[in-house]
C-alpha cells in the first residue's frame, strides 16, 4: 500500500551511465511505453539503490544479512519454485516437514519417534502469530459453545512491549488486546500482573522470548506456574503462546536449562523467525504446536489444486521455496554445535560492545545479560543532547542504529539499540565504540544545545532551578523535537 505523495517535481528518472544504451527518460510513476536494453534497466535501478543503507551496518534489524555462497547458490537455484505446488515439488515439501520436526524437537515438543510434529513454515513470525492466534481463538470458541456461553468478547493478554504484529492480530481478528504496562527498570511483562488480567474470555497469554526493546526473556516458567494455579481454581484452561521470534534460536543453545518451551504444560504453541537467529535471509518463519489437538482441524484446508491433496494452514498461498531450502541447509550444515558456536560468538561481541559503551561513562545499559545478543542503552544526562541526535550523527559513518522511547508508563526513557548478528565482528564493535565517542564529543558543543541552556538560564537565575528546568526540557521538549526532526529517517523497532 503506497501512502506517499509525489514529492519530486521531476516525474522522470534520468539515466547516468545507462545513457550509453538509451537517451529516453523513464517515467517514475507510470509504466514506460517502450522497452529498454537489459543493461540500461539494470544500471538505472542500481544507481538508485546506491542511496540505500548498507545491510551489514543496519544494526536496527534482527534479520540475517549474510549467508554462505553455497547457500546463496541453492537459493538462486530454487528461486523459481512455487512452494504450494507440493505435488510438483515433493522434495521441497519434505524439507519443510523435516525443518518443522527439527524445531519441534529443539523446543521439546512431546513427539514420539514415529510421530510427525505439528507446524508449518510461514513468511515470518507475523504470519506465524496470526495462525497461532486463530487456533487459540477457535479452541476458546469451541469450549465456550460447549458450555453454552457467549463467544463475542475474546481477549488476549500481552505485555506492552510486544511487537506490532500482536496489535494487528487483535485488530484484524476482533480480539481485545489487554496489555500489561511496563515500568522503569522493568521493561517486560510481569507474569503476576498478566495472570491477574486473565478472565474467562482470555484465549491465551502471550509471552515474549526476546523483547524487541531490550532483548530480555520474559519469565515463561513463572507465568506457567501462576496460570496453572488460576486454571485449577477457575477451570478456564487458559493457554500460553511463546513468541520466540528472536530468542527461539538463542535459548536452546546458550541457556539449555531455561524452561520456556513445551517442557511447560500450558505452553501450547511457539513461533520463531528463521530469518533472524535461524540465520536465513528475510522471508521465513515457523510455528509449531504442542500436539495435534492444539490445532483445530477445521482451520486446515485440504486443497486438490494440481493433482494431489494439499493440507495447508496459512494466510498466504503462492510463495517461494528458496528460504525453506536455505533453512534446511543451515540446520544440516551447522548442526547443534555450529549454532551454539555462532550464538556464543554473538554474545561475546555483545559483551564487548556493552563494556565499551559503559567505559564512556555517558550511558546506562538497559538490556540484560541474559537474553538476545543486543545492547540497549540510554543517556545518563539528556540535558545536552539526546539519543535521537546521536543516532542521526552516527549515520555519517554508515551506522543505522534506532533510537526510540519505551512504551506507555516508561515512555520518558529513550534508548539506542544495537543488534548483534553473526556478521557483526569484534572489530566492528570496536569501530562503533570509537564513532560513538567521537559523536559525543562533537555534539556536546553544538550551538543548538548551548542556545537551549542559555534559554533555560534566562528563565531563572537560580542555578539549581536551571538544572531542574534543563532536565525537564530535555525529557519533554528536546526529545519531542529530535523525534520529529529524524522521524523520516528513523527505523521501525523490529
Swiss-Prot record:
Its cofactor is pyridoxal 5'-phosphate. GO terms for cellular component: plasmodesma. It catalyses: L-glutamate + H(+) = 4-aminobutanoate + CO2. Expressed in flowers. One of its GO terms (molecular function) is glutamate decarboxylase activity. It comes from the Eukaryota. Catalyzes the production of GABA. The calmodulin-binding is calcium-dependent and it is proposed that this may, directly or indirectly, form a calcium regulated control of GABA biosynthesis. Belongs to the group II decarboxylase family. Homohexamer. Interacts with calmodulin. This is Glutamate decarboxylase 5. It comes from Arabidopsis thaliana (Mouse-ear cress). The gene is GAD5.
